[in-house]
Every structure is written in structure tokens, then in C-alpha cells.
Amino acid sequence: MKYFFLRFLFLISFSFLTTTIYSDNYSYKVVVSELEVPWGFVFLEDNSILITERKGELIHFVNGKKIKIKGLPEIIAKNQGGLLDIELHPEYKNNGWIYISYSSSNESKSGSNTSIMRFKIEKNTMIEKEIIYKALPNSKRDRHYGSRIEFDQNNFLYFSIGDRGNRDVNPQNIDRDGGKIYRLYDDGQIPIDNPFITNRSAKKAIYSYGHRNPQGMAINPFTKELWIHEHGPRGGDEINIIKKGANYGWPLASFGINYIGTKFTNKTSISGMEDPIHYWVPSIAPSGMAFITSDIYPNSKGDLLIGSLIFQYLHK
């Protein structure tokens, strides 16, 4: 396994990358500078970039200039909350749909939770805005929003919502939002083969549960499986391959401990629950996730890249 040290902004495109001494030679190019907390980005067909700033700005970087998109929804940018991920519909060229995740109260007076919205852009303004999922209830705990978005080869929409800092209530209860991976049709409707569709009390959009704070997500282009990474507490960051209806164990099983050094569980594996395919102790604070598919890097094709916020390297 190789480690490429970097000053991390967001995975590859916004990185100031340096290399350790290995046979491969890498260089970097600063694509966009003077960003505060960029959380997600997508390239458009003209190679311009849509970038989310956590503070609540959507930036269109085109021809070397930053244009702020107008008409954004209500966004509560506090601590870990704000404007988070962004993803294009697989048929964006034909339908123009763009998807974002963000923390909002949905006009409630108290707290916030993760929302998923789709919209189009016309004349640098959001139009046709549709909230296709809003996690409930709102919480005043402004952390663990999850919020990564991904489409699969069948145009199913997947997204994550973290446990919202309430590990003892949310992750193991399928009748509550939080600590879950969700699956919807692109318009927000619930697939009839979702795993808990016949459970009267369950949140029907749930696809898997028992997660802490999944903030990396990618479809493996070779196996078509959904891969995620999630933040552990003190130790216990994980990589998981998502299976329909599966329980990933949080907080009943973990390789991590409380931030103060005490244990909250003595178990790292439980029969009937999924174990991570990889975990980190100590934590690396994973951020960003992408499979290498380009023939430009033949020796790395198929490898997975994950950035570390703590140690400031790119993990392969």
C-alpha cells in the first residue's frame, strides 16, 4: 500500500500533492484556489466545475472565474452542517437534473437534519427545485450528517445520513432516520424492492443500517458494488461494501473507542452483522473516495483512493 502525502482540500482536484519516494512519479496542478471548505464537486461537459462550499454557496467555476449560483434553499451552515455533496444525474445531458445534500430545518424552528434536493440551473439560478428526501426528526446536534450521494448503473440514487450524534437511538432503529444508507428512484419515489418496504414502521427508503457517519461513497466500476467509508470515533474508521438490508453493527461492534479513551463496546464483530473490509486504528478521518479507471495509470487501475484529513495523505 502506498501513501501519498498532501495538503488536503478535497481528494485529487483540489489537492496540493507531494509524493514520497516511489517508482511512480506524480505531479499536481492547482485547479481552483481560495476556497474555504469545499465539500463536493462535479465536472460538467465543458470541463467547468460545480463546487459546494459548506458555508452555503454553490460555485460554478468556468473559464477561470467563480460564479455564485443564486436561489439556493434554506441551508443551516453550523459546525459539520451546511451545503454538502453534489451529483449529476447519469442522464444530465438530456434532463439537466442536479442533486445536492444539505442540512436544513425545513422551516422548523428547532434543529436540522439532512435534506436531498434536485434542481436545474438556468442563467446561474436554481430552478425546478424539488426536495426528494428530508430526514426527521430535526436535531440540535450539528454533526454526523453523512450526505454523500451516488448513482448506480441502473440510475438508483443512493445517499448517506450519519447517526446525527445519537448513536444509542438512531443507527440500529429502522423506524428512524440516521446511521443509514438510503436508496430511491431519481425522482424520490421508493423502489418496491427496497429491503424494508413491507415493514410497516420502517423508513422505506433505508437500504442498509448500523452506520456512524458515512462520508465517502463510490460505485466500484468493475464489480458494480456500492462501497462506502465512514468515520469511526477514536479509531475504527471503516470501508464497507453495502449489501441490501444489511446491518453494519454501529455502535454494537466497532474497532474504535470513545474520544476520552473509554470503551463503549467490547465487540469488534457480531454474528449476523457485516464486518468492514478494512478499518483504521488510529483514525485517519477519511475524506473523498474514487476508483482509478484511467489507462493513464495502468499500474494503479482498479485501485481505490481515499484522502486522510488527519495525516494529510492520499491513501491507495
Enumerate the predicted regions with their spans.
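Acidic, Gly/Ser/Thr-rich repeat motifs that build Ca2+-stabilized beta-propeller blades
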Residues: 21-167, 216-219, 224-232, 282-316
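Beta-propeller domain segments
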Residues: 81-83, 91-93, 164-316
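Hydrophobic residues within membrane-embedded alpha helices
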Residues: 9-12, 32
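Bacterial N-terminal signal peptides that target proteins for export
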Residues: 1-9
